Amino acid sequence: MTIAGKFPPTGCRNVAGFSLLELVVVICIISGLLALAIPKLWALQVEAEKVAMEQVLGNLRSAIGIKVADFLVRNDMAGVRSLTGSNPMDRLSEVPSNYRGALNGANPDTIAAGNWYFDMQARALVYRVRNQDYFRGGLGKPARARFAIRVIYEERGRNTNEIAGATLVPLEPYVWVDKD
């Protein structure tokens, strides 16, 4: 066996791989794309939290509306009034997976961000915000929003005690902000 059979001729090299310059160019392109994508992905995460919170609030308002309609059909105004200060989560057939229950004297610092709980002392439903830098209002640090059921009165003539319904309202104003 000759050596010539083991090595290809010098003019026909089969080079596998790529050069260092090509590697640097690919890394620069990928880094640039990531630099553009990461802020957008972060904004989507904040938007997802906002939408999830609003979806739970919408579900609660619908459930409260159904209960109010039930009371109004039976002309049970005391039943409507009894909703004030009650736990809105009790109106749902299935509570969200991030609901921690009714807590007596809960310390918000001990509740994980992104969770709901009912503060039995304040008679308020509380959401602990995960993306605190994008949330203004509520009760400060840790960022949280509180809600309670309130009866709505309708003014007809001189009678201001006519019940029109009940709804879930924020106890303090809040807003989600963009950090652009």
Regions found by a protein language model. Give the residues of each.
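N-terminal single-pass transmembrane signal-anchor helix
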Residues: 2-3, 11-45
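Intrinsically disordered, low-complexity regions enriched in Pro/Ser/Thr/Gly and acidic residues
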Residues: 89-180
